[in-house]
Amino acid sequence: MKRFITVCAISAAMTAGTAFAETVKVGYMTTLSGGAGIIGKQMQNAVNLAMEHKGGKLGGMDAEIIFADDQRKPDVAKQLANRLMKSDRVDVVAGVIWSNLLMAIHKLSLIHI
């Protein structure tokens, strides 16, 4: 299910709001520290490998991936999601592993649509 949501989010980023953009920006927020950090690090390595394999492109567009460590904390996830959407101006936020973190940020994404 998480993989499906990630694929949908990336697909949406490539079609909505980026039609005239030169680069699609993806905020990849995942758990990179603590005991569960190994999962997020493996995901980060997979994303980096895929980007290398695809020549830094998503759907034929240049892509920039901004990684962020949510520390598996809902309050940190909210702050990071806000920063990624407002300051970094990402087209999509992906990579969230834990449902409690997704629940913490899902309303923010509706505000920024």
Residue ranges and their predicted role:
Residues 7-15:
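Bacterial N-terminal signal peptides
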Residues 28, 84, 88-97:
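Periplasmic-binding protein-like
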Residues 63-87:
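Structural motif
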Residues 17-21:
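Sec/Tat signal peptide C-region and signal peptidase I cleavage site
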Residues 44-67:
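Signal peptide-proximal N-terminal region
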Residues 111-113:
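Conserved small/polar residues in nucleotide/adenosyl-binding loops
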Residues 1-6:
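Bacterial N-terminal signal peptides that target proteins for export
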Residues 27-46, 68-75, 97-100:
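Extracytoplasmic "Venus flytrap"
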